[in-house]
A protein has these predicted regions:
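Nucleotide/pyrophosphate-binding catalytic subdomain
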Residues: 1-142
Length: 142
């Protein structure tokens, strides 16, 4: 049977939750199912990204952005190390590319002093884009 499994933010919110997701996927795969996995952003990541985008518009110290980006990276890499250490190099590249893109758009928002609906929507999408590992990796880890 072909299945699509969608896991929301709390399902991928922390290390223990992700391990449960992997177990669910493994059980279904071991039962002979073909699986497509869709994951949301980790718990509160989207909210944090939105808050940072809104704050950066009027922020006078861009170092705040660097701190936010470092914290966001640490959270994702720490989770990755605990859940899928064999994929750390590959997935870290995936995360770093997306973080660089996010930082670039946030710098543009800061420089323009404007957060348009279009840029806000684009920024919001990074919560999912930063999900700890590429959904295709769940099957390999499981």
């Amino acid at each position: 049977m072909r299945l699509v499994m969608k896991f929301g933010g709390t399902s991928v919110g922390d290390i223990d939750a992700i391990r449960k997701v992997v177990a669910i996927i493994k059980e279904s795969r071991d039962a002979g199912n073909e699986i497509a996995v869709v994951v949301s952003a980790m718990t509160r990541v989207t909210d944090q990204i939105i808050a940072e985008a809104e704050r950066i518009v009027t922020c006078t110290d861009r170092k705040v952005l660097d701190t936010f980006m470092a914290d966001l990276r640490t959270r994702h890499i720490t989770t990755l190390e605990a859940v899928a250490p064999d994929y750390i190099d590959e997935v870290t590249k995936h995360i770093d590319i997306r973080l660089e893109r996010l930082k670039n758009i946030l710098v543009a928002v800061h420089n323009l002093r404007e957060l348009t609906p279009r840029s806000r929507d684009y920024i919001i999408s990074f919560g999912e884009k930063l999900s700890v590992f590429n959904p295709g990796r769940y099957q390999e880890v499981a």
